[in-house]
Amino acid sequence: MVSQALRLLCLLLGLQGCLAAGGVAEASGGETRDXXWKPGPHRVFITQEEAHGVLHRRRRANAFLEELRPGSLERECKEEQCSFEEAREIFKDLERTKLFWISYSDGDQCASSPCQNGGSCKDQLQSYICFCLPAFEGRNCETYKDDQLICVNENGGCEQYCSDHTGTKRSCRCHEGYSLLADGVSCTPTVEYPCGKIPILEKRNASKPQGRIVGGKVCPKGECPWQVLLLVNGAQLCGGTLINTIWVVSAAHCFDKIKNWRNLIAVLGEHDLSEHDGDEQSRRVAQVIIPSTYIPGTTNHDIALLRLHQPVVLTDHVVPLCLPERAFSERTLAFVRFSLVSGWGQLLDRGATALELMVLNVPRLMTQDCLQQSRKVGDSPNITEYMFCAGYSDGSKDSCKGDSGGPHATHYRGTWYLTGIVSWGQGCASVGHFGVYTRVSQYIEWLQKLMRSEPRPGVLLRAPFP
């Protein structure tokens, strides 16, 4: 009897002639003996080619017994459907398999190129992630970041002036004498002596004055090039600030008692009052304009605009300070902590005046803080919206008599701007008191209108304000 194992094999293979009479010796005891088997004229096993034609199953690859060959992504998963385990056998790495399986199982979510503006796409299971270039944001990198910039936030990223626009992104602009660079935010000088730059430092490749008035230090020659010295009858009167070749800003109270206006002289490029070094330029003051709201002997609206008889020549030692736009001054410059004040005023309260130009770095205070500090020493100064406080409450440093009318200059991103005018204070460097400055931003439009208008007759003029 043919063994059960052989019969089963024959049935599974469906072979014809598998059990031919002469093919297998049959043992009398019901069991086969290898030693008694003798080959007959018929075969039990067929050739590989015949078997390949007999075995019928769902085709998964290009050849028989493909599992014995190295895995191929093209053969296993592109021509036929493969399982996760089969893909893992091909990649030999779980993470690589997962990355492949995301796209293989639900399609490539990046196929439609959803990421805009140069963003790169990473496929996820039924989703995708866009990696945006630095200037863009959003799910599909569809939003230009600058669209979210507003001028009140870091000046909109602008180096100088910023303008907000409804429905569109903010735009940057530059002061006269500068032009906007291709990046849309930076400004570059277009003239030899633009306002707010210090040529002496530019040529030395430095950025800020070395000098740090009462408690101050000497401003190195050429590092305060907009400083003006006002003389009347040859005597020191006040300070001032050059804002272009023909206009100077000072304090109105400096002119309360002037009688001989023809002897009012403005000196530019001055440094040491005890010597003449050839960099000075003297110009007669042709006209003094004060606000109609200023009352002599008081402190409110303490500002004056002076027109020179002839323009000055801009040099390394004579450069105007930028008169900023009002919005820029109020929302940006007003929050710069420290600014410079300069002048030839008294070095001590009731002391001698300075021979060399002095400069002091002073912190700006909120009006409420200024009032609170003053009340602690029993004082209640009248600080209006046309003024601001700056200085130190410990009595160590301050502007003083003789500095009046001089500049409070604020530095922002490489350029200096006029933000205040030395006006008044309780003594000089008195404990618990601060210097009070005219808030120039309140008068920007007033100043610009006067400078654009035709000259009017007269030396002292009162112009309507506001």
Curated annotation (Swiss-Prot):
Belongs to the peptidase S1 family. SMART domains: EGF, EGF_CA, GLA, Tryp_SPc. The modification 4-carboxyglutamate is found at E66, E67, E74, E76, E79, E80, E85, E86, E89, E95. Heterodimer of a light chain and a heavy chain linked by a disulfide bond. This is Coagulation factor VII. The gene is F7. The modification (3R)-3-hydroxyaspartate is found at D123. Substrate binds at D398. Its EC number is 3.4.21.21. The record marks S113 as: Important for S-112 for O-xylosylation. Residues 106-142, 147-188 form the EGF-like domain. It is found in: Secreted. Residues 213-452 form the Peptidase S1 domain. Residues 21-60 form a propeptide. Disulfide bonds join C77-C82, C110-C121, C115-C130, C132-C141, C151-C162, C158-C172, C174-C187, C195-C322, C219-C224, C238-C254, C370-C389, C400-C428. GO terms for biological process: blood coagulation; positive regulation of leukocyte chemotaxis; proteolysis. GO terms for molecular function: calcium ion binding; serine-type endopeptidase activity. It comes from Pan troglodytes. Residues 61-105 form the Gla domain.
